[in-house]
Amino acid sequence: HVDKKVADKVLLLKQLRIMRLLTRL
């Protein structure tokens, strides 16, 4: 199964990606 820490890291990376896309608009 996926480790909680890894899942949290992936979530953070996704959020950062979305933030960057939003700031670009």
Swiss-Prot record:
Subcellular location, record wording: Secreted
Single biological process term from Gene Ontology: defense response to bacterium
Main location as per UniProt: secreted
UniProt keyword annotation of Secreted present: yes
Key words of the record: Antibiotic, Antimicrobial, Fungicide, Secreted
GO annotation, cellular component aspect: extracellular region
Record's note on what induces expression: By bacterial infection.
Role noted for this protein: Active against Gram-positive bacteria B.megaterium and M.luteus, Gram-negative bacteria E.coli SBS363 and D22, K.pneumoniae, S.typhimurium and P.aeruginosa, yeast C.albicans and filamentous fungi F.culmorum, N.crassa, N.hematococca and T.viridae. Inactive against Gram-positive bacteria B.subtilis, S.pyogenes, B.thuringiensis and S.aureus, Gram-negative bacteria E.cloacae and E.carotovora and filamentous fungus B.bassiana.
Protein name according to UniProt: Spinigerin
